[in-house]
Amino acid sequence: MELHFLGTGAGVPAKKRNVSALAIRFLERNGTVWLFDCGEATQHQFLHSPLSLAAVEAIFITHLHGDHILGLPGLLSSRSFQGAETPLDIYGPKGLEAFVIQALETTKTKLRFPIRFHVLAEGRIRDEEKLSVDALALDHPVESYAFRIKEQDKPGTLDAEALKAMGVPPGPLYAQLKKGETVKLADGRIVNGSAFLDESIRGRTVVIAGDTAPVKAMEAFASGADVLVHEATFASNKKDDAHLYGHSTIADACALAKRAAVGQLILTHVSSRYARNENEYRDEAAALLPNVIIAEDLFVFELEKAGRKKRD
């Protein structure tokens, strides 16, 4: 699982930071991509990455401010122009569908692929065999959400040698036992599969928060996550301004990461006021949480299986 930070700035584009966009590429799913927010020029950032527009399967929009959605019509148009025909799911607050449809109709853009729009609400918004996505409402001047992407836990390794020693021959029964099921052998013996399984492998969890002032419910929502991607628009000396406009400071994000016991905090949505000199911003973050990462455009964070991680 790779997190590709395509845009890490706040409000307006800057020379080194484009506006908000983050893509997750699922290597175990043939490179399928989920995109979170789509600020202006996000499709340009795709050109500087190994990602393909055709691989985008779902788009999740945290809120309807322009720096998070103005790149969406162009990206959809280019995805179609490049020949993609697979359906696309788009999740976002009420009003997103109207924005997209109006932009496409005004520009006389016809897409090769169908779009399935989903209006966001708190709770489970996507449920697959191995992945789920939950949403949590945040605190911002417009409706804004955080997303929790969670893999299902995987069964532990089956102790085949112990089963063979018991006289249980390899075959279809092993598939049932690996699921932890109880099976009856031909000789009448009952075998409980869970007794022959190692501990299950915990699925990975990534939490991505949209623009927000501190929200108490985020602590439980992000609890134990392998990765928390959180905005830190301002340094902590701008706390009053941050909260007034529905944003967080470095200290807010770091405190949340500590309370929620997350494995890795990655800060994004950095105000352009720090463009000329980010040293103080970075120094504050490092002092509050030594392993914190401040994402830059095109930075890639790889979260390996079983929660192992590495950065590029």
Curated annotation (Swiss-Prot):
Binding of Zn(2+) 1, residues: 63, 65, 140, 211
Keyword Metal-binding: yes
Stored PANTHER family: ZINC PHOSPHODIESTERASE ELAC PROTEIN 1 (PTHR46018:SF2)
Textual note on the cofactor: Binds 2 Zn(2+) ions.
Binding site for Zn(2+) 2: 67-68, 211, 269
Catalytic activity, as annotated: Endonucleolytic cleavage of RNA, removing extra 3' nucleotides from tRNA precursor, generating 3' termini of tRNAs. A 3'-hydroxy group is left at the tRNA terminus and a 5'-phosphoryl group is left at the trailer molecule
Coiled coil ranges: none
GO MF: 3'-tRNA processing endoribonuclease activity; zinc ion binding
Keywords assigned: Endonuclease, Hydrolase, Metal-binding, Nuclease, tRNA processing, Zinc
EC code(s) of this entry: 3.1.26.11
Originating gene: rnz
Name of the protein: Ribonuclease Z
Assembly behavior: Homodimer.
Function: Zinc phosphodiesterase, which displays some tRNA 3'-processing endonuclease activity. Probably involved in tRNA maturation, by removing a 3'-trailer from precursor tRNA.
Catalytic site positions: 67 (proton acceptor)
Keyword Cell division carried by entry: no
Obligatory cofactor(s): Zn(2+)
HAMAP family (UniProt xref): RNase_Z_BN
NCBIfam families for the chain: PRK00055.1-3, RNase_Z
Highest taxon of the lineage: Bacteria
Stated family: Belongs to the RNase Z family.
